[in-house]
């Protein structure tokens, strides 16, 4: 009818979708988590690529922690010196409030580092990989690249097998509830284990 509009959702045509993505697709834990939280936002962000990326302060702090801990463990450098290097080489201009939090969290980094060193001393897994990119490619009607970045993998080769531990650093509070797994939630560590095993 003239001047009418139907706001009901109509599915995307499958062949149009395959052509749009060029029959290939990237998946990660964060994109899957985004889908479970809001499929429409996932569609806008990961399919149509309409997201305008702005680094939030939380992401900045996460990058700071990863940078400092990796280099402190590998190169045995001072935590305070590494924090200064990160701040000076990062383009973000910190507000006074952000500087206050960075200084406060920097002191906590020393405690975290000491705790990690104690854990390493009591572990039999002596080999480490940092910020390891892992991916598994599944070919079919659509080629899917399943990828992830694992903060740290500790491993030891024994006989014909390899024992691994996957570590993911969190700067915020995260609930890990295995009861959520059947619903596709709290999947980060199982996904990383799958990627590490199959890549």
Where are these regions (language model features)?
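Active-site-adjacent bridging/hinge elements
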Residues: 36-47, 80-84, 154, 160-171
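Short, well-ordered loop/turn and helix-capping segments at boundaries between secondary-structure elements
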Residues: 48-49, 53, 70, 74, ...
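Active-site-proximal structural scaffolding
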Residues: 10, 25-28, 36-37, 58-62, ...
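A non-catalytic, helix-rich entry segment at domain boundaries
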Residues: 64-139
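Non-catalytic protein-protein interaction segments used by genome-maintenance enzymes to assemble
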Residues: 127-197
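Short intrinsically disordered, low-complexity coil segments enriched in acidic
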Residues: 1-6, 100-104, 191, 199
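C-terminal, charged and often intrinsically disordered regions of DNA end-processing helicases
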Residues: 1-71
């Amino acid at each position: 009818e003239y001047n009418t509009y139907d706001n009901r959702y109509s599915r995307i045509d499958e062949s149009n979708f395959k052509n749009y993505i060029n029959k290939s697709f990237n998946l990660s834990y964060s994109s899957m988590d985004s889908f479970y939280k809001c499929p429409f936002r996932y569609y806008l962000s990961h399919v149509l690529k309409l997201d305008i990326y702005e680094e939030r302060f939380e992401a900045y702090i996460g990058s700071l922690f990863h940078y400092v801990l990796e280099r402190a463990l590998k190169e045995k450098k001072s935590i305070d010196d590494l924090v200064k290097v990160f701040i000076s080489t990062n383009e973000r201009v910190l507000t006074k409030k952000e500087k206050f939090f960075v200084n406060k969290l920097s002191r906590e980094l020393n405690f975290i580092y000491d705790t990690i060193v104690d854990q390493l001393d009591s572990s039999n897994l002596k080999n480490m990989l940092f910020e390891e990119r892992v991916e598994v490619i599944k070919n079919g009607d659509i080629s899917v690249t399943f990828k992830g970045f694992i903060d740290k993998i500790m491993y030891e080769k024994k006989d014909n097998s390899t024992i691994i531990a996957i570590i993911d650093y969190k700067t915020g509070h995260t609930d890990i509830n295995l009861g959520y797994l059947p619903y596709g939630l709290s999947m980060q560590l199982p996904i990383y284990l799958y990627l590490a095993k199959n890549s």
